[in-house]
Amino acid sequence: MNDPMDENNLLNDRDMIKDGHGKKQRPNTSKAAALVILFGVCLYLAYSTLFTEKQQPVEVQKEGIIKQTELFRPAPPKPVSLEPTIEKNNVLLPKVELPTPPKKTTNSDDSLLEAAQRAPVLAYANTQKGQGSTEKNKDISANQPEAKPDETAQRFNHLLKPTTLEGIRAAKLGNRNYIIAMGASIPCILETAISSDQQGFASCIVSRDILSDNGRVVLLDKGTQIVGEYRAGLKKGQKRLFVLWNRAKTPNGIIITLASPATDALGRSGMDGDIDNHWLERIGSALLVSIVKDATNYVKGRLPKDQDKNNSETISSGQNIANIAVENYANIPPTLSKNQGEMVNVFVARDLDFSNVYKLKVIENKKQIVNRALSRNFYKNSAVICNEPKLAHIER
């Protein structure tokens, strides 16, 4: 009843069905494998994020605030040791105890003082950061333009300010009978000759009597010796030599410091004289160089070519020596010479006071009649005693 063909067909159909189911189930297995892989990746990421060691972050120093726990108290002053001191007479003095001032008690209810004492102190740990910030601030301030005031307003304010002039009070010169005032001129005859090649001293003799400022008393007698000094060396173009007169000595042995410069008859500073510019030495050195050069060139031309190389150093050395001689003679400074017996002047640069060495005595003319009934000090008011220009006689 059962046909074998039918069974074979059924078997083939089943195989066909299995093959069809198999083909349909392949996509499902691939999806499952993808899900498994995705799940594994998720597990790996979760494991790596949860169980791996965390990197320690870089610690950044923060500004710490240190709170003050105790009240601010200033440092107590050091006590002064009052030990017995030893005097010059080697006597020990007893120890002295000074009364100490009472301590001031502060009220604890002063809230402002207590708040100031308990105020927190800010401590900055990172100094480099602070320095960098200050430098940045300086750079920013340097880049910013400076705020200049209004120039017109500043000028106007300056114009409104008057010029302040300090007043100078007049003073008395003193007793003019004893004073040679500044600005006086003392004629003097040179006692020694002067040459500016070397520095040295000079002396001169006063040619006439030098009177006081009022012209009544002779303070520097004729024949007074004045000593001075001068420096060496004149610069090129100078024709006057500076001389400083230091001291004057009268024939009676009275000395006084002058510290005054020398002048000529017209009051020009310095001392003139004969100037020697040493033209002969300068021109002679130049001629020497030219002669040496011509001679070396002539000798060089007469030498054969073989000996020219050997003698070139000798010829060049001769030219160098001549050049050095020219340089030395070209820098010779001029020389000023002044002979003895010539007239010079001394310009008094300060007031000369002779009151501590001279004393005046009032003298009377025998032919003059004086009213003795006058109650007057004749020493101070000498015009009553003598009407002549000559007032007094110096007692030395």
UniProtKB/Swiss-Prot annotation:
Question: Record's Pfam families?
Answer: TrbI (PF03743)
* Keywords carried by this UniProt record: Cell inner membrane, Cell membrane, Membrane, Transmembrane, Transmembrane helix, Transport, Virulence
Q: What is the annotated localization of this protein?
A: Cell inner membrane
- Transmembrane regions: 32-52
> Polar residues bias located where?
126-144
* Membrane topology, record value: Single-pass membrane protein
List, alphabetically, the CDD domains matched: VirB10
Q: Does the keyword Magnesium apply?
A: no
Q: Which GO terms describe its cellular component?
A: plasma membrane
Give the region (Disordered) as residue ranges: 1-29, 126-150
Subunit info here reads: Interacts with virB4, virB8 and virB9.
- Similarity field: Belongs to the TrbI/VirB10 family.
The entry's protein name is: Type IV secretion system protein virB10
Task: Look up and give the organism this protein is from.
Answer: Bartonella henselae (strain ATCC 49882 / DSM 28221 / CCUG 30454 / Houston 1)
Q: Which gene encodes it?
A: virB10
